[in-house]
């Protein structure tokens, strides 16, 4: 079931498209088609699963930017991470694994201040 996309989600999609340099890059990160991101930006409904992915990506991204510069944060998302059992953070975003991601980011933050 689709529902109208709240303004906050549309705003997040727009901001993330800018942060990741294109709608195509955001679509790849979220594991959806580029046309779907375009529809969201035009106010089309978003399903709950993808809305959660957008929310999680925004949360992860904003926390990563407290630790890293944007290019390093992008690399962190795509790199294999030992704190995540040698999985890529981006795959956990797609799977909605918020707790594991935030735990890894907190560990990264603690290491950066140690």
Where are these regions (language model features)?
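Non-transmembrane "mature" sequence context
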Residues: 1-114
């Amino acid at each position: 079931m689709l529902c109208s996309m709240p303004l906050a989600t549309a705003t997040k999609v727009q901001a993330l498209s800018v942060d990741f340099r294109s709608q195509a890059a955001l679509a790849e990160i979220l594991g959806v088609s580029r046309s779907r991101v375009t529809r969201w930006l035009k106010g089309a409904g978003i399903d709950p699963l993808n809305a959660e992915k957008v929310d999680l990506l925004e949360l992860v991204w904003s926390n990563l930017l407290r630790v890293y510069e944007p290019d390093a944060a992008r690399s962190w998302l795509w790199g294999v991470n030992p704190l995540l059992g040698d999985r890529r953070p981006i795959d956990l975003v797609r799977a909605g694994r918020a707790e594991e991601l935030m735990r890894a980011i907190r560990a990264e933050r603690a290491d950066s201040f140690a």
